[in-house]
Amino acid sequence: MRKKIYCLLLVLCLLLQLALPVSASTMGDMESYGVRLIQYYLHHQEKATDVIWDITRQMKELDPKQGAVWEKIMFDWSWINSDMPVYEDTIPTDLPTDDSLCIVVMGFGLNADGSIRPELKDRLKVALSFAMQYPNAHVLVTGGQTGAVDGVTEAGQMAAWLQQNGLAKTRIILEPQSLSTTANAVNSYKLLTRAYPKVDSIALVTSDYHIAQSCAMFAAVSNYQSGYKGGKSLELVGNAVCDTGLTENSLVTQAWGMSLIMGIPFDEKAKAPELYHVDIPVEVYVEPTETEAPTAEETQEALFTPEPETVEVQSKWKAIEKWVLLIAGLVALAIFWIIMPKKPKKRNRREKPKMNWDV
């Protein structure tokens, strides 16, 4: 009887595992795919476009929701580093004019005495011009304590400077906790989505060499929260930068931040993965004609978009496979129950054995 109970529990565990939308092995596979995506882009950038499309396609087969999130993250990351327009010492003119827009000003390390450094002041000058051009927009200043004076934060010093130079206090939002670009993105997203529900678009202000990293982190946080957690999407609609003459744009730092946001490991010293050939279906990628050449964004979007019918068929087969395994488990349990030998009846201890008197 005990063996039957153990067998029944084993089959029930199997059925419970089949009923779960994503198994532990699937989660492990998704993490492995995510690590590969980041490493491929880190080492090969746009040369890995076909490979990235192939990996996100495989991820969608395992879990359509998670695969779609990664697809959007990789598309945005690539676009930010290759095709995103950067406004240097000028302000974009086509952004929302109401209070749905928030201008996010990235902090910069303070002096030991808590005073503002010249580069941060340059960022603030650009932010002030931005805010004057969009008088209904909120202005979020983000940055924690980086000087030696307790309680003096980048955000607090930035807010004070903006007020001293004519910006109304009611327009300023303080985020005084963050000590890294990734934390800037995470904490700013939380603050805006929880306390300012009308805000649905953001524009970033920082230094020229820092804009790609900042935009990549903010886009990744928004995609992760809206795609995985069902949160609100904050669209990145513009930027403005101060000119420093520096060209530093560390993809390693971006990859580390991306991994941190997505909750996957990152090995800076990992060997560069080798590119491989991918046959892109004709339905997915069509050669541009001479008369109507698509933009870089349209081309990348086509590469990252598999055929809808293919995804639908794959989902149906996965459902059929689950039911086949379920029925097979029940049949195996029934067969085991039938063929399992029964224990012989125990003799009643009170019943005395019959004596043979024929001697």
Residue ranges and their predicted role:
Residues 345-359:
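Cytoplasmic C-terminal tails of single-pass
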Residues 249-290:
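Glycine-rich flexible loop motifs, especially short His-Gly-Gly/GGXG/HXGH segments used as catalytic or interaction
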Residues 18-26, 315:
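Sec-dependent signal peptide cleavage junction
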Residues 1-5:
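Positively charged n-region of N-terminal signal peptides that target proteins for export
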Residues 25-262, 292-298:
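A structural signal for short, hydrophobic/glycine-enriched beta-strand patches
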Residues 9-17:
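Bacterial N-terminal signal peptides
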Residues 319-340:
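Selective detector of the "anchor" transmembrane alpha-helix that sits immediately C-terminal
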Residues 289-318:
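C-terminal low-complexity, Ser/Thr- and acidic/Pro-rich disordered "stalk" regions positioned immediately N-terminal
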